[in-house]
Curated annotation (Swiss-Prot):
Entry-linked SUPFAM superfamilies: Calcium ATPase, transduction domain A (SSF81653), Calcium ATPase, transmembrane domain M (SSF81665), HAD-like (SSF56784), Metal cation-transporting ATPase, ATP-binding domain N (SSF81660)
Cystine pairings recorded for this chain: none
UniProt-recorded name of the protein: Potassium-transporting ATPase ATP-binding subunit
Organism taxonomic ancestry: Bacteria, Pseudomonadati, Pseudomonadota, Gammaproteobacteria, Enterobacterales
Record bears the keyword Ion transport: yes
Family: Belongs to the cation transport ATPase (P-type) (TC 3.A.3) family. Type IA subfamily.
UniProt subcellular location: Cell inner membrane
Organism, as annotated: Klebsiella pneumoniae subsp. pneumoniae (strain ATCC 700721 / MGH 78578)
Keywords from the UniProt entry: ATP-binding, Cell inner membrane, Cell membrane, Ion transport, Magnesium, Membrane, Metal-binding, Nucleotide-binding, Phosphoprotein, Potassium, Potassium transport, Translocase, Transmembrane, Transmembrane helix, Transport
EC number: 7.2.2.6
Catalytic activity: K(+)(out) + ATP + H2O = K(+)(in) + ADP + phosphate + H(+)
Gene: kdpB
Residues that coordinate or bind Mg(2+): 518, 522
Length: 682
């Protein structure tokens, strides 16, 4: 991965965010955040009062009112700055993607074949269904499917990965992305989208903050904050007539300051930034989420469906042993296995040749000198091999070799059946070798479980997340690998229909399911899953069915996606806890100061020993503004994540952010009060 990572407080982003924070003072922007809109109205009201007092139109301290007004404006500006910083990071990422888009001409074919006549047209004029020809050095003008040819493609502009990939017609590697470059050969591509709907266009729209919609949890929290704000607004509004009736009317400036300190301005000012930053962190992991809803769902996931190959195991099965049938020498089996693999360029085939060389010093032989014919593997026969004179050597799956042997008049030995079961039980894949109608024995192919994966699954289990391994292996092999890897369950001999049924079963139990996929056959299950991470190297159908795309095409990334989702939810919950606890502490500063003249008994609540009512109120307002600034890095970066159970996580957050939220204001407000007093400002 070579994509450049932005510093948390990039100087250029900070400068732009400061300008954007001022622009966001517009009431057309402020009303979208009801909590901060109340602060904005209070700032405007106190500003007008300060001007009126300075001009003699109203009685009261113009200096005190102006000071409160200035810090209320700072409160709004700091909240705007937090949101602008988060949006700025997303826009910077989007701008880097926009740089990939290039104005180009396309060779539009008049017929869907390589040698058809071409028309040179601007790429933006292409429509869904059009067929284009691209050759070495060309920029692919549209998203589409390869219908003819094969080529090496540089996708670094999209993925950040410098290694080229192969794209060819047929199979799961036929999908191409507009904006990538052909390095060699040629492709005939059928466009699958219209201009403005390409994967690159969708990526840009996804990461730009302006396109972000609030998630369900964010909406629910916003409603709670609005409800609290309305309660405190009504409570504050009723104080003025009561205090006026008692003969000691509380000033409007004090009431505005009281209201701002009572309502949850800290989380209200940071809520939008947390959501935008969550999507930005997901992009930092090279995963594109279609919406904040997808990121949020990742944090709530409690079932992970994980492909065995590449996710749980290394995915490159290696020959580990030769197990001869009764009456067959191991060297004879190794010689036949090596001969059948001489032209097999798969990792498994090469490992068989190497193992035979290591065990019996059997050197590679040249097929031409042997006058041999290689028989390639096909999905229909499920075996491969070699024909040398009268010898017919085959290797393949148990069922395929059984049919082959019986078709040639032989029989499948019972002792080999037992060996097959034993190999599968140990978590290896049995590959049977036969010569003519005679079964020679088994090659055991071992797929290595990734180091540390068992510990990661144990952490997920602590968090209440169930892990399910998906594999095409038989049940015995699947059970052995599942036990070695430490997953909670497995689905063996998996088919697309079985995956879909399993997802629906878990969802019917009220669980949220996450999975990865890359093929067209994965599309139904991806569309059904709550969090569906499609591989960028996969088919167009898979990418359209998923709600996230992993640009690195790494199936293990699903675990990281869940961690990022949980971190976003934890950040929102932690800062909400801190904000509400903050408000409780601020009551002890501002309520005695505001009402001591009306109700002298409240003086006993001045536990901080603040200098005067004016210094107490101003200190609380200043602290209320500054705490937003101090929490901006936490909102952008996210709270530190630890894989704990829900109850342990709740206890930890209550101690850190609940108790911290209570104590920090006492220290902060007292320190500000001392500074104001020593400087003679109050």
């Amino acid at each position: 991965m070579s994509r450049k990572q932005l510093a948390l407080l990039e100087p250029t982003l900070v400068r732009q965010a400061l300008l954007d924070a001022v622009k966001k003072l517009s009431p057309m922007v402020q009303w979208r955040n009801p909590v901060m809109f109340i602060v904005w109205v209070g700032s405007l009201l106190t500003t007008l009062l300060a001007i009126a007092m300075a001009g003699g139109a109203l009685t009261g301290s113009a200096t005190f009112t102006a000071a409160v007004s200035i810090w209320l404006w700072f409160t709004v500006l700091f909240a705007n700055f937090a949101e602008a910083m988060a949006e700025g990071r997303s826009k910077a990422q989007a701008n880097s993607l926009k740089g990939v888009k290039k104005t180009a001409f396309a060779r539009k074919l008049r017929a869907p074949q390589h040698d058809a006549p071409v028309d040179h047209v601007p790429a933006e004029d292409l429509r869904k269904g059009d067929v284009v020809l691209v050759e070495a050095g060309d920029i692919i003008p549209c998203d589409g499917e390869v219908i003819e040819g094969g080529a090496s493609v540089d996708e670094s502009a999209i993925t950040g990965e410098s290694a080229p990939v192969i794209r060819e017609s047929g199979g799961d590697f036929a999908s191409v992305t507009g904006g990538t470059r052909i390095l060699s050969d040629w492709l005939v591509i059928r466009c699958s989208v219209n201009p403005g709907e390409t994967f690159l266009d969708r990526m840009i729209a996804m990461v730009e903050g302006a396109q972000r919609r609030k998630t369900p949890n964010e909406i629910a929290l916003t409603i709670l904050l609005i409800a609290l704000t309305l309660v405190f607004l009504l409570a504050t509004a009723t104080i003025w007539p009561f205090s006026a009736w008692s003969g000691n009317a509380v000033s409007v400036t004090v009431l505005v300051a009281l209201l701002v300190c009572l309502i949850p301005t800290t989380i209200g000012g940071l809520l939008s930034a947390i959501g935008v930053a969550g999507m930005s962190r997901m992009l930092g992991a090279n995963v594109i989420a279609t919406s904040g809803r997808a990121v949020e769902a990742a944090g709530d996931v409690d079932v992970l469906l994980l492909d065995k190959t590449g996710t749980i195991t290394l995915g490159n099965r290696q020959a580990s042993a030769f197990l001869p049938a009764r009456g067959v020498e191991e060297r004879t089996l190794a010689d036949a296995a090596q001969l059948s693999s001489l032209a097999d360029e798969t990792p498994e085939g090469r490992s068989i040749v190497v193992l035979a060389k290591q065990r019996f010093n059997l050197r590679e032989r040249d097929l031409q000198s042997l006058h041999a014919t290689f028989v390639p593997f096909t999905a229909q026969t499920r075996m491969s091999g070699i024909n040398i004179d009268q010898r017919m050597i085959r290797k393949g799956s148990v069922d395929a070799i059984r049919r082959h042997v019986e078709a040639n008049g032989g029989h499948f030995p019972a002792d080999v059946d037992k060996q097959v079961e034993e190999v599968a039980r140990q978590g290896a894949t049995p590959l049977v070798v036969a010569e003519g109608e005679k079964v020679l024995g088994i090659i055991a192919l071992k797929d290595i479980v990734k180091g540390g994966i068992k510990e990661r699954f144990a952490q997920l289990r602590k968090m209440g997340i169930k892990t399910v391994m998906i594999t095409g292996d038989n049940r015995l092999t699947a059970a052995a690998i599942a036990a070695e890897a430490g997953v909670d369950d497995f689905l063996a001999e998996a088919t697309p229909e079985a995956k879909l049924a399993l997802i629906r079963q878990y969802q019917s139990e009220g669980r949220l399911v996450a999975m990865t996929g890359d093929g067209t056959n994965d599309a139904p299950a991806l569309a059904q899953a709550d969090v569906a991470v499609a591989m960028n190297s996969g088919t167009q159908a898979a990418k359209e069915a998923g709600n996230m795309v992993d640009l690195d095409s790494n199936p293990t990334k699903l675990i990281e996606v869940v961690h990022i989702g949980k971190q976003m939810l934890m950040t929102r919950g932690s800062l909400t806890t801190f904000s509400i606890a903050n408000d409780v502490a601020k009551y002890f500063a501002i309520i005695p100061a505001a009402f001591a003249a009306v109700y002298p008994q409240l003086a006993m609540l001045n536990v901080m020993g603040l200098h005067s009512p004016s210094s107490a109120i101003l200190s609380a307002v200043i602290f209320n503004a500054l705490i937003i600034v101090f929490l901006i890095p936490l909102a952008l970066k996210g709270v530190s994540y630890r894989p704990l159970s829900a109850s342990a996580m709740l206890r930890r957050n209550l101690w850190i952010y609940g108790l911290g939220g209570l104590l920090v204001p006492f220290i902060g407000i007292k320190a500000i009060d001392l500074l104001l007093t020593l400087s003679g400002l109050v």
